[in-house]
Amino acid sequence: PITELAGEPVEIPELLKSAGIVRLQLNVNGSLNDFQTELNGQTDLGNVAAKLHMKNATGSKPEYEGWLELHNLNLGAISGDSSLLGRISAVGEIRGQGFGGPDFFVAFDGKINRLGLNSYTYTNIELTADMGPSIFTGRIQSNDPHAQFLFNGRIDFSKEHPDMDFIANLSRLDLIPLGIILGDSI
């Protein structure tokens, strides 16, 4: 039971230290190692809501499965690369193992309502993907006004030059609004 935590010091992860004021509503049912949780979190970095089942939570390879919603979450601040990444709003089903390292794996099936990338905010993206430390396998369908495409395949980033096996159908890609080409240089 959760009473096992009574009197134990809690170490705050670096990420939470930069989150500013954190408002957290958390319901947990189960043991430390296997529990159901409902979470609503609001921070200066954005908002998170989740309904998850955690297994092996105290082990080296925690497993999780459930539903996740991100609202206006600042990926740039979290990753330390605000020049490339902006904010994300997304909702979907999630299943995974670990939170980093060589055994990390996450599967996501849902919708990215907005994603800031390279100074442009993409909208209306459907994503079904399996992702590991160096591998992406999945399907991305973008219905953004400036980027309409379907990607289905695999990219392995573990080598010096990524190994790619995919099919892409590109309907529209407006390079200037997307910030891929600056000004009228074409």
Regions found by a protein language model. Name each.
Residues 1-186:
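Interface amphipathic segments
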